[in-house]
């Protein structure tokens, strides 16, 4: 069984991640991974970039102009195309992805974790910044996100 793991590092300068993410560099050195340096769209906000990366379209076409613009995108995207081909997808990421590629609006109860065999994102685990402040840290720790990602990469029976 072949698997593809796409890792997007948001807000980390290219030189820093190449220097600091030794485990990923190890995969590259062993031939188990490849690195692509991408050029950002403008505006270079997270939501705008996510929409462009997964649809291949510029903001002028998909209409996501910043993090406040959220809706279900009605364009072919990586998740829907992979699912159409009969394969499974998974995402451990920000709730923007659920809203863009699964359904809008994001529901904190129903959409935080789901397994939907017929959906564009077959297995989804999402975090959100909703309610985040200095007193209320809503974002899960990196170790929790990577543990969840590891579980999604295990064979599903």
Predicted feature locations:
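Generic enzyme active-site microenvironment
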Residues: 8
